Amino acid sequence: PVVVSGQVQADRYSQDGKLQLLVDFIDLIAAGKDVSQLLATTTKDIQEYKKKFINLVAQVKKPPLRELLGEIFSGERWEKFIRNPAAKRFHHAYIGGLLEHTVDVAETALAIVGAMPNIDRDMVIAGALLHDIGKTEEISAAIGFSYTDSGHLMGHITAGVLLVEDAARQVQYFSEADRKSLIHIILSHHGDREKGSPVCCATREAV
């Protein structure tokens, strides 16, 4: 990474109002120096989004499913989840982006299924909260938001499935039906195979 100082101003020779960047100084940043303030960061209130997330988890009525969420969103992974970007460049590509995107998806999903009969509301919440959990393993929150080894070798969908599989083994009485339903949501959340999902949506909760 480098530090740059300069200014942006209108190009007086441009006919269409283009801007030009005038660089006064550029230098390498010393190794180990804190550069977190240089990273793009969400404009939303992180603390408010954390409260929204916790409230969503609290709405899950099935104890094993709620316990699974607690198992996954804890410790170091929780810290990575609230800090990580949701993508390298396509959407929510900034610090706090993954938390923001996840909460927004969950709230939208709940608004859609509010009046729908014969749907597992708990599974909708859990699936929405976990659909991109693999991005805590796929993308680094350091400068450049580069892909990790897991990101290059597996991608976030596979990483997410592995995280859920591992957590489900730690939760007593976690049903096989819920395990399959939750994993299906993660596998199918891109919608189509052409968009990266190994399978297409086959349950109401996944849709």
Where are these predicted regions, by residue range?
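Divalent metal-dependent catalytic cores for phosphoryl transfer on phosphate-bearing substrates
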Residues: 90, 100, 111-207
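Short, well-ordered alpha-helical segments in soluble proteins
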Residues: 57-64, 76-77, 102, 106-116, ...
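OB-fold and OB-like beta-barrel modules that bind single-stranded nucleic acids
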Residues: 1-12
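A short mid-domain helix/strand-loop element embedded in enzyme catalytic domains
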Residues: 65-108, 130-134
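Extended, charge-rich, solvent-exposed interface segments
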Residues: 13-85, 159
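A general alpha-helix detector
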Residues: 52-53, 108, 163
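A ubiquitous short alpha-helical element
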Residues: 35-41, 92-94, 148-152
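Residue-level signal for short amphipathic helical patches enriched in basic/charged
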Residues: 60, 93, 119
